[in-house]
Swiss-Prot record:
GO biological process: translation
Main location: mitochondrion
Top-rank taxon: Eukaryota
Organism: Neurospora crassa (strain ATCC 24698 / 74-OR23-1A / CBS 708.71 / DSM 1257 / FGSC 987)
Record localization: Mitochondrion
Pfam families: Ribosomal_L14
Similarity comment: Belongs to the universal ribosomal protein uL14 family.
Function noted in UniProt: Component of the mitochondrial ribosome (mitoribosome), a dedicated translation machinery responsible for the synthesis of mitochondrial genome-encoded proteins, including at least some of the essential transmembrane subunits of the mitochondrial respiratory chain. The mitoribosomes are attached to the mitochondrial inner membrane and translation products are cotranslationally integrated into the membrane.
SUBUNIT field: Component of the mitochondrial large ribosomal subunit (mt-LSU). Mature N.crassa 74S mitochondrial ribosomes consist of a small (37S) and a large (54S) subunit. The 37S small subunit contains a 16S ribosomal RNA (16S mt-rRNA) and 32 different proteins. The 54S large subunit contains a 23S rRNA (23S mt-rRNA) and 42 different proteins.
CC annotations in GO: mitochondrial large ribosomal subunit
Protein name per its UniProtKB record: Large ribosomal subunit protein uL14m
Amino acid sequence: MIQLKTMLNCIDNSGAALVECAMVVGQKRHASIGDRIVVVVQKQRGADSAGMAASSAATKVKRGDIRHAVVVRTKQKVQRRDGSVVRFDDNACVLINKAGDPIGSRINGVVGQELRKKKWSKILSMAPMQA
């Protein structure tokens, strides 16, 4: 369950490492796997002082940016139709643009199969594994 102020890992190569949930899109209080949220980038990936100029040119987002995202993993248990229960070690998301296309070109780590039911096929095709 993702709600306001929840911190999530960003698992794509868009340049964000840690994001904070600012809003759940739609008339819902909590977001689960496959739901769209609005996030604020809290920490940038690879933004060290030595390579700041090189890394800032390669990143697509920077700290403080407000972006849309899709939740791909949650620590909250999710019950599936076949009776199995899945639970991940962290809360994670993938940044998307307003049209729903992923900002990054690669996804690191597993994503939940619930994305298939909610029609996020582009994210599923980029992910190395589904759980």
